[in-house]
Amino acid sequence: MNPRRKSRLKVVMAVLSGLAVAVGLTLYALSQNIDLFYTPSEIIYGKNNDPETKPEVGQRIRVGGMVVDGSVKRDDKTLKVTFDLNDIGPAIQVEYEGILPDLFREGQGIVAQGTLVEPTKLKATEVLAKHDENYMPPELGDQMKKQHQPMGISEADLKGKSERDATQISQPFGENK
């Protein structure tokens, strides 16, 4: 190979190597910002009731649902707030420290983004309130339709206090009674 061709090959290889590194770093950065969307029922049971698809403790997720009436507890000395969130099924607890949106209230639909710190507890870094009480985010509405239409929903389910949910949460993984 002549010297001119060698130098061209070196330049092409350097450009391709730089491009590969840039693509790799971009994909890594994007993977750090991907937050999967779940409903409270999907956190408890897994997507499509498959326990293998439950989010893991420590995973960053987004969860959407309704704030359970009577569940909002505020700390008098700090901006820390805890509340329960459900979607016609079991409720999960959300802990948030900061200023809540003006539209946040009990019975209101919200989306919380944060880290799952326990199987049924989310430490939120951001809380978004819906703008209209009749509005339902499309992804939340679709998930609720898919998951809850075939189920018999009781009044206790609507309030996040179903006995069936309590027994399933307390059972170790894979154990059926």
UniProtKB/Swiss-Prot annotation:
Sequence ranges on the Cytoplasmic membrane side: 1-8
Periplasmic topological segments: 30-177
Name of one Pfam family that matches: CcmE
Gene this chain is encoded by: ccmE
Membrane-spanning parts: 9-29
Single GO biological process annotation from the record: cytochrome complex assembly
GO cellular component, one term: plasma membrane
UniProt keywords, alphabetically: Cell inner membrane, Cell membrane, Cytochrome c-type biogenesis, Heme, Iron, Membrane, Metal-binding, Signal-anchor, Transmembrane, Transmembrane helix
Protein's name in the database: Cytochrome c-type biogenesis protein CcmE
Superkingdom: Bacteria
Naturally occurring in which organism (per UniProt): Glaesserella parasuis serovar 5 (strain SH0165)
Compositional bias annotation for Polar residues: 167-177
